Amino acid sequence: MEFLEYLTPITSHQWGIGSVFLLISIPLIVTRLLTTFWSWRELSAANQKAPGQKRGPTRPTTIPLIGHIVSFLLDGPGFLYNTARYYGRGIPVRVHLATFPSYVISGPELVSAFLKDSTRSLTPMKRSLNYMEHAFGCPHDLVKSFATSDDKDMEQQIHSALQNMLSGPRLGILSERYQQSVKSQVLSVDAGIGDEWVELPDLCTFVETHVFQAATRTIFGPSIVDLNPTLAKDFWNFNKRVKTMFLGIPAWANRTAIRARDDMTEDIKRWQRHAEKNCNIDEIPEDVEWEEYYGSKSTRIRQQLLTKRGITNESARAAENLSMMWATNANSIPAACWFLLQTLHDPLLQARVRKELDAVRIHDTEETNKAAAFKFDITGLTESPLCQSVYAEVLRLGVAAMIVREPTHDNLALGDWKFKKDEFISVPTNNELMDPDFWNSGTPKDPHPLDKFWADRFLVHPDDPQSGPRKDAKKQKAKSDGKPYFSMDGCTWNWIPYGGGAHLCPGRNFAKREIMLTSAIMLTAFDIELLTDTLPKHDKSLFGFGTLPPIGKAPCRIRRRQL
């Protein structure tokens, strides 16, 4: 009797746990079964429709009400990679990411049609306005000021200001100033690197801090940096938390991120007030390409166009300036860090890269500081085969953005598929950048998996028909000198770190120069030895918004290099 009494509480306790388990698991199982049935029903219905009339199925889910957001937050790249293959590439699959339902599309036919947007029927406007408000801090009642207006000429002028800054002669002027600014910053007394070895706890923190300041001085002028001693720290703190604001997490549940954004907008407002007080922007001569209050001519023009558009509220202007600052730093600087880390990690690659850099390095006769008496032929640098291949591979491996558009009219056809007005359509760039059916992954004797860095992936060796970026590489005409050369032939709709087609990033040419010049200057100005055999991983927590920065530290020792 006593034995049975002893067992009773245990049995009751076990049944209690079992009941809780059943209460939790039954809704999950039922949800999975129902959504799987419905998904297959949608796919079956699509297969019976004519081309141009098919509707994509919804991916099954397990958790009721909240959709796929948990899977996305746990492993965004893996979730979207598997989504694209759930029914096979080329079939759009609908997912629900909290307040953001979207069709995920993949495959060359759909992706090229989406990016080309030949009928100009896709727009990023709604998401852009969402980002302007929630991520960059534009007041809610003013955010529509940034929407397309009836003043088409004004829209064209704003777009033209960006295009002119980042292409043609102005690109060359801006790139030369950037080169000088980075050199001055990293070789300054404040940087703390001399002729003797010093140890840094993290190479990337050094690069992020000093290159951000150099880039910001180039684009916005020196005042914004001088007025805000913590600007670099504030920016990277904001960048670390920006994803939660992009996703629209309510402010009451996201106070740390909101504080980080507010720190940045206050820094920018301080600069705006200083510039307005000390400089009459309308009196600056048209031919002045750069001055100390507003920096580049493009920044100055953008401020004038905002005024003409009626956007005079300082918070709204600070939001626009923060969006520009984020766009010009948050992707290119982490990419430069990866260029450096991958090069320094491989002594043979480092020697090959430095050989190319030496070939395009010239003596800077105007520089009085002997350690900085060098500069690069920027055209020669950006055409260097190996350096270009390293650059392209860094972006292929590290960029994980979501290109999001929505149809401007009902029944938009992309390939065989139909989309309704205002439905979000997304291309996760890493799905195409990591496509095993497209990219060259080496040979059985010399494999180079797509999730591993391969410096030569974009080089064509004339004597090796299996070289080059594509798995199905066609025989390419060899150059007369017989040397390896950089190639992107046939990669237009797979190598898409900058998007493509109608909405190709206008800053891509300057970003390439930022990444390559930063890396070239660091490798030329300094001897750098990594103090770890293992490189950091990509920070997948920032998936969806551009270049994934390193997570963890890369300790090193560094000294000025004797040229």
Curated annotation (Swiss-Prot):
Q: Which cofactor does it need?
A: heme
Protein's organism: Hormonema carpetanum
Q: What InterPro entries does UniProt report for this protein, alphabetically?
A: CYP450_sterol_14alpha_dmase, Cyt_P450, Cyt_P450_E_grp-IV, Cyt_P450_sf
The membrane-topology field of this record reads: Single-pass membrane protein
Q: Which PANTHER family match?
A: 24-HYDROXYCHOLESTEROL 7-ALPHA-HYDROXYLASE (PTHR24304:SF2), CYTOCHROME P450 FAMILY 7 (PTHR24304)
| Major enzyme class | oxidoreductase
- TM helices/strands, residue ranges: 10-30
Q: Please classify the protein's predominant subcellular localization into one broad category.
A: membrane
- A GO CC term? membrane
What one GO molecular function would you report for this record?
Answer: iron ion binding
> Where does it live in the cell?
Membrane
What keywords would UniProt list here? Answer: Heme, Iron, Membrane, Metal-binding, Monooxygenase, Oxidoreductase, Transmembrane, Transmembrane helix
Q: What is this protein called?
A: Cytochrome P450 monooxygenase efuG
Short name of one Pfam family:
p450
Give the GO terms filed under biological process for this record: terpenoid biosynthetic process
Its Enzyme Commission number(s) read 1.-.-.-
